[in-house]
Amino acid sequence: MKTRQNKYSIRKFSVGASSILIAALLFMGGGSAQAAEQQQDKGTVENSTTQSIGDGNEKLSEQQSTQNKNVNEKSNVNSITENESLHNETPKNEDLIQQQKDSQNDNKSESVVEQNKENGAFVQNHSEEKPQQEQVELEKHASENNQTLHSKAAQSNEDVKTKPSQLDNTAAKQEDSQKENLSKQDTQSSKTTDLLRATAQNQSKDSQSTEEINKEVNNDTQQVTAKNDDAKVESFNLNSKEEPLKVDKQANPTTDKDKSSKNDKGSQDGLANLESNAVATTNKQSKQQVSEKNEDQTNKSAKQKQYKNNDPIILVHGFNGFTDDINPSVLTHYWGGDKMNIRQDLEENGYEAYEASISAFGSNYDRAVELYYYIKGGRVDYGAAHAAKYGHERYGKTYEGVYKDWKPGQKIHLVGHSMGGQTIRQLEELLRHGNPEEVEYQKQHGGEISPLYQGGHDNMVSSITTLGTPHNGTHASDLLGNEAIVRQLAYDVGKMYGNKDSRVDFGLEHWGLKQKPNESYIQYVKRVQNSKLWKSKDSGLHDLTRDGATDLNRKTSLNPNIVYKTYTGESTHKTLAGKQKADLNMFLPFTITGNLIGKAKEKEWRENDGLVSVISSQHPFNQKYVEATDKNQKGVWQVTPTKHDWDHVDFVGQDSTDTKRTRDELQQFWHGLAEDLVQSEQLTSTNK
């Protein structure tokens, strides 16, 4: 019996020594963590928040490692002592020993949870606790652990002394103890979960606050670190350098502190122990979300589309043409009809192109001015002299501008269909030579004058391409367009759609054909009846006549720096009488005008596309021309071969009933035209 008492004394001594060792190591861990905290506090405000999290985690890892190591040592000592004391006891005694170990592990878990709570508070308070407070807390927990170990050791020794007859009662007590321990673990797990949620919310708030500071300062660089191991700790490094936001090239970069922790076996054991007890050190998920957002924002780069053409392509519609936002519902899409969207198809195939939106019934002069402001941007100024001469308002609608930097040296390609070909010729003339009448009027009356009328704006157009354009006018306008009944019908339609509730815009608002907000429709009709438009030559119907076209030809000239090209179609066949008759596949509304032109007195004018004679579409009579070849030329009209069985709208695909003209054929035509425009830039580029 004395020998057993001596062994019991040695056991008490070893347990006490272990407790002292645990307390000493805890003090050392706390001192190390405090030293790290004091060193980190020297940084900026942003760094202090992030570094305190790292210090808290490092402290937790060291304490867990120390506790795990000492508990293992204690367990080994107890195991040796118990083996010497019990020797070959019954299996029930072995179960008793195992129960003691489980109880010790529970105490260890309680200690870890308590330490975790301290670290949570440590993180939330941004490392502002004093070293003395930490030491008091550590001493308190060390004392509790020491008392627990003594009590367990004493209980174990007394149980060993107990006679075998008392083992049954001990087993029953052990079962009760197990139930209590399980209940404690559930309670601790619940508390730990609540603690983690609170810690995660605080850390998320800290992260958001840090991001707001970073946005205000605009000088911080975030370096985001992430690890795939769920037990690892993510960290943010906020540097006060005046550099843009950067993300490390490595997917999962690690700091020196992480590397040292990785190599520390004790830290790994502590983290593993925390995992087994459902205890986490940081809210990793919230930081991963921030990391992903930062990486997405950093890696975003503005995509600058590269076009095949250096100079944008501007598509200019003809008489009675509209863009989709202002056209009557009975009309199809102008550029492509139901077959395709020409502008969109060009864009998808690498060509920058735009659809101009100008007056449907206006004169070439007014349309050219509108086209200038459509490209350049601004409020349309028809000119003081021009407005006074024809009796309409000086100013029109305001355009945003599709090419605001348009100026000499910054060129464009102008492609006009039908009357649009005349309009783009008028615009180029105004750019180069301006309007002498406007210049003189401004000298006499003062006021402002648009730069367009001052002239001297050469090298702004790379090429001029016309499709079925009546360069020399058309018999259709001579015979029908200027008849009183036809003119009245056309303008009545414009007047009807000019009411304030209509979205349709014929481009005659400067003539007063737009109902005012406080004006009744009856008042609007009476006012419009007195408009000078009905007898004016400043209209599209006049400019399409042979006289109107001849007047334009006299006022315009070829620019030696521009590539000119014309495309012509015909959709009539010769009869036995020598006249031209509309083909069966001609667009139905054009059969009347096509047959009318086919009966013209001048035989050379009879072949036509339904609206325009072939001879008028090829080139202006008073200007130089050549047959087009594979090699482009400047300063001369290049006439392409006439396209047979192509009527006036086949160039823009508006006839959906024409089975001969397919979508693929239309697409091929426009792709070839666009490629030709790109080739012409080699001749007209000012950067050679």
From Swiss-Prot:
Name of the protein in question: Lipase
GO MF entries: metal ion binding; triacylglycerol lipase activity
Cellular component GO terms, alphabetical: extracellular region
Residues cleaved off as propeptide: 36-302
Entry's family note: Belongs to the AB hydrolase superfamily. Lipase family.
Enzyme class: hydrolase
Species assigned in the record: Staphylococcus epidermidis
Key words of the record: Calcium, Hydrolase, Lipid degradation, Lipid metabolism, Metal-binding, Secreted, Signal, Zymogen
